[in-house]
Design a protein with these regions (language model features):
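Accessory helical-bundle/CTD segments and flexible terminal tails appended to RecA-like ATPase motors
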Residues: 1-189
Length: 189
């Protein structure tokens, strides 16, 4: 993880010019996503995202299941994980389902170049690549963000604070809505 972050930082800072040329060549060959610029997308939330003690009584077992979920990346893996939980413990409560949706949210955020996503107070804030000179800001991933903002100007806005660029999207009260919003962003051209 540390090595990946260091390589990403070098690509975006020290060798940004060289990588920008590489990105131009790559753009002709394939779609450039935010994953080319972000090593990981962290999620912070004020929502209740957990497996309640009533659902999984053993705290050590809950911790193991949280760790396993944190390691998942594909929707198919999350579905298999959910099925295993239901086989063992019964129907997954709503806060557990929301927790499992974080896997998709993190993947979509990374694809769009978000280093962090906050879900707080009914709003979703995506924090983009830290380096303002990064070729990310000329990529298709960021272009999709701009297109989404143009389509929904009353719903979202772009801001820059202390050199950090972010987009705030209003009326996103759940992880499910956040995932649906980012899925829509990824489909825009």
């Amino acid at each position: 993880k540390i090595l990946t972050e260091a390589v990403t930082e070098l690509k975006n800072d020290e060798f940004a010019d060289l990588y920008a040329q590489d990105a131009e060549v790559k753009a002709e060959e394939e779609v450039i996503t935010g994953e080319d610029f972000v090593a990981e997308c962290n999620i912070e939330s004020d929502l209740e995202l957990l497996f309640p003690a009533e659902y999984i009584p053993s705290s050590s077992e809950r911790m193991l299941l949280y760790r396993e979920l944190d390691g998942l990346e594909l929707d198919e893996d999350v579905l298999a994980y959910k099925n295993r939980l239901e086989d063992r413990f019964g129907k997954v409560p709503s806060e557990g389902l929301e927790l499992m949706r974080v896997v998709s949210l993190r993947r979509l955020g990374k694809r769009l170049g978000a280093e962090r996503i906050f879900l707080k107070g009914g709003r979703m804030t995506l924090f983009f690549v830290s380096n303002p000179d990064s070729p990310y800001y000329q990529s298709q991933a960021f272009g999709r963000i701009i297109n989404f903002m143009a389509r929904y100007p009353r719903l979202c806005n772009l801001r820059e604070q202390n050199g950090k660029r972010s987009m705030v999207v209003k009326d996103v009260p759940t992880v499910e809505m956040a995932v649906a919003t980012l899925q829509e962003v990824t489909t825009l051209n």
